[in-house]
């Protein structure tokens, strides 16, 4: 019985804890059944810029998708952000194969007291 418990524990850990869908995501906002996360564990800084992943998880599908992930670059000195890549996912928490979307190559300045301002301040301070 003890061996069965050990095997079950190892199997459970390898399936759920190693899943990239759930690793590292920290909830930063929620509303209307939607939840938004930042992966603070994978923040990278280089040449004065900060790079990070975001995830939006939707209660009701958005255009047929239950989640979306983006990879972003932030300029902490000028306090602006640009999305480098964006993908929609059929499964929650960024699961399943992503459909990459073309995005405009422009910098955005977060509105004061917005979730975007909070996220940029959070990643810049890490």
How does the language model describe each region?
Residues 6-13:
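Hydrophobic helical h-region of N-terminal Sec-dependent signal peptides
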Residues 13, 18-20:
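N-terminal signal peptide c-region/cleavage motif recognized by signal peptidases
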Residues 20-126:
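N-terminal secretory-pathway/extracellular module detecting exported/lumenal segments
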Residues 1-5:
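Positively charged n-region of N-terminal signal peptides that target proteins for export
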